[in-house]
Amino acid sequence: MPNRQASCLSALPHLLNLPAVPIRIPVCSPARRLTMWDRLCSYCSLLKGRATAHNYVALSHLPVARSRASLSIATAACLAVTLIMLARAVRPAETVGQHGVPKAADGSDDGPIHSIVHYVYIKENASSMLQFPFASFLAVFAAAVHLKPTRIYIHTDFNDTEIRDAGARGDRWTRAMVAHSFFKDLVWKQVEVPTYAGQNDEERISAVQHKSDFVRWEAIAPVGGIYLDWDVVPLRPLTPLLNAGFAFVGGRQYGGAAEDGSVNGTINNGAFMTKPNSAMARIVVREQYMQFTNAKWASNLHSVTSIAEHLVAIPTEALILDRTAFAPTHWFKNSADLLFLPNAGPSSPEAVSVNTTDPMELYANDVRNRRRRAGWEMDFSSTYLLHAFSMSQYLDYVNPSTILSRTSNFGIATYDMVRKMQVLGYISATGDDDDDDKPAELLPEHEPPDGE
């Protein structure tokens, strides 16, 4: 009898063209079980067509003589659907894995996160002009060297005419980015910028930073990749993180005393990476409009942090790194001064490199370099991405000559990149390239920098 039951029950989904699911048969007395079984088999026998019947029946009125069969089929279908719903309620196989841990969503693939870099450049107002200081060129150059992206996207609301004008009449580094881009796979992509959010679209999105928050997630969600703010400078390859198997990788950030801890520990929204259509990206895109409020500047940060922290419980969906990974400093003056301002006295000595892959030798060499460094020097050895907050307020100190002098922490962190620019001819051998009006035509055109 058990084999006969299993055979008939397993045939039900096939006959009804329904997905097969495990069916739990309630435990009851033998007599009652036999009665229920006989009824179910009776329904199954009604579903079987005659030997001469065709498999296909046109969607037309059935003869009166077949009304009883139609009623039986409908009744059997209702019974099967009821059994399926009961089975799914008892064992929700799609959402629960071993030991009661939810399984990962189907939206993320099994491969690494794609090395596609995304930037967002949104107008502050209707009269805004497209401009790139040396700091932006440095950030994109470092991304090209360390991350080896297959493509770099700049998502913007500037139109094609405005972009061409900037490439023709902008200052040196603007022309270098637009008209003489060193990275041949840099793509400008026009986007629509939202102006209202909230549960009923009653919240006007005024700040360009908030508009960028919406655009970045909508842009990266379908294709995946690495999102970077313009003040984020990659310091080393992200390959270990891209290949770690997680659908989303983010890092926490520091806050300041004036914020009473409301930002400290939140996910840094200016540097993260995601697979295409990851659960993180889809949920943020779905919920960011409802969660936004102008009354709380950091509402997006809190929403993103809450989503990521909940996804950590789902295997391989989210990895959250500590503060030093992406944001070792913060945007308040006491931290920004330490990062950007030059220090008096001798320059910090250059780090000595060793030609080995042995981790013990590399660690010993790192210890020797740390003992030689200046007393004011920060340790970025555990930093992948340097989110240099408040960079726009310190542009006077973000230039080739200051960086090559090795007298600031930002200069030490980016020294190797600027030296590479010298070797490739992007800046002069003396490093005297602080004049933004210097002709961009002297730069190599469409010659992407090699990796390390």
Predicted stretch roles:
Residues 28, 35-212, 230-452:
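Glycosyltransferase-associated regions of secretory-pathway enzymes
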Residues 213-225:
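Small-residue hinge/turn detector
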Residues 1-44:
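N-terminal targeting leaders characterized by basic, low-complexity, disordered sequences
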